[in-house]
């Protein structure tokens, strides 16, 4: 996605700890046209698989997942990182390490919104090591739903997340690929795949 690659090149900043700051694009401020294009691109990739749900993780995955679900015309469900008092009844849970949150996060999805009848596409903001996506895939598997594919806005190719997701046996689509980055200012971005 050329517009996204250009925007990351122009606005992306590398922070200590291997964190890519793109909060003016996808994590804090959202650009409507760019977000719409993300959804359209993911929908073209995954629409032929006939998903019934788009699933993501709060918070930064919500915008691209919602844009995708709007194009596909299917509901979007997001895993919560804290169980609210309104989440009554049984839930699927998983744990994952979050670099940006600085520790382990627990994920929650109500049984009410994910079932064995669902055909799921996961859309999220980043693919780094793949740990959080593997945790979410485990929740989907536990529900009996069929995981059809995963899409991530930005992939940090050097963290091997794609290889870690290979065991899932589903297509993985990314929109921008960070080939190399360092705190000295190096940021090499290519189109995703």
Swiss-Prot record:
GO terms for biological process: purine ribonucleoside salvage; xanthine metabolic process; XMP salvage. Xanthine binds at residues 20, 27, 156. The keyword Mitochondrion does not apply. Its EC number is 2.4.2.22. Pathway: Purine metabolism; XMP biosynthesis via salvage pathway; XMP from xanthine: step 1/1. Keywords: Cytoplasm, Glycosyltransferase, Purine salvage, Transferase. It holds the Pfam family Pribosyltran. It is found in: Cytoplasm. The keyword Methyltransferase does not apply. One of its GO terms (cellular component) is cytoplasm. 5-phospho-alpha-D-ribose 1-diphosphate binds at residues 128-132. Homodimer. Converts the preformed base xanthine, a product of nucleic acid breakdown, to xanthosine 5'-monophosphate (XMP), so it can be reused for RNA or DNA synthesis. This is Xanthine phosphoribosyltransferase. The lineage of its organism: Bacteria, Thermotogati, Deinococcota, Deinococci, Deinococcales. The gene is xpt.
